[in-house]
């Protein structure tokens, strides 16, 4: 399962939010997915050029206002969409103040630069496309949302 999402900070809740991109190139609607009404924060996000990307196979929590339960992602800016990393682990360690030696340059960038930019300056406009995968929603089977990131 993989899909691309638009990422932005919700300044009211101080939470990193993910919004699925819209339609496939053929303009075909997505079948079997119910989408809640967009919040004011989601509506404030500008239209994104990646609206042609597919969303087939996303779990239902991907459309939750709290965002997906768990996330594996990498930035499209680096042209590394095929090698996502588990951001939940990095975010948890960062929240606890733990430091580990990252195995890749990409992981180092995300941990030390991208999250810091989001925490201190807000959204980094060049880094908007992410790969979703490995969601706990399917494994745990719980309906309760899990906000995966709040800035310190």
From Swiss-Prot:
Its main location: host cell. Multifunctional protein that plays a role in silencing host antiviral defenses and promoting viral transcription. Does not seem to be essential for HBV infection. May be directly involved in development of cirrhosis and liver cancer (hepatocellular carcinoma). Most of cytosolic activities involve modulation of cytosolic calcium. The effect on apoptosis is controversial depending on the cell types in which the studies have been conducted. May induce apoptosis by localizing in mitochondria and causing loss of mitochondrial membrane potential. Residues 68-115 are annotated as: Mitochondrial targeting sequence. One of its GO terms (cellular component) is host cell nucleus. A fraction may be phosphorylated in insect cells and HepG2 cells, a human hepatoblastoma cell line. Phosphorylated in vitro by host protein kinase C or mitogen-activated protein kinase. N-acetylated in insect cells. Pfam families: X (PF00739). This is Protein X. Signal peptide: none annotated.
């Amino acid at each position: 399962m993989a899909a691309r999402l638009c990422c932005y900070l919700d300044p009211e809740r101080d939470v990193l939010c993910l919004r699925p991109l819209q339609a496939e190139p053929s303009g075909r609607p997505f079948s079997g997915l119910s989408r809640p009404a967009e919040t004011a924060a989601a509506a404030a996000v500008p239209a994104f050029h990646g609206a042609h990307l597919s969303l087939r196979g996303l779990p239902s929590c991907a459309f939750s206002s709290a965002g997906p339960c768990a996330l594996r992602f990498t930035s499209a800016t680096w042209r590394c969409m095929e090698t996502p990393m588990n951001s939940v682990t990095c975010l948890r360690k960062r929240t606890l103040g733990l430091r580990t030696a990252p195995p890749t340059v990409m992981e180092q960038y995300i941990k030390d630069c991208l999250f810091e930019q989001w925490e201190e300056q807000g959204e980094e406009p060049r880094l908007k496309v992410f790969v979703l995968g490995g969601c706990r929603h399917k494994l745990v089977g719980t309906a309760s949302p899990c906000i995966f990131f709040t800035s310190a």
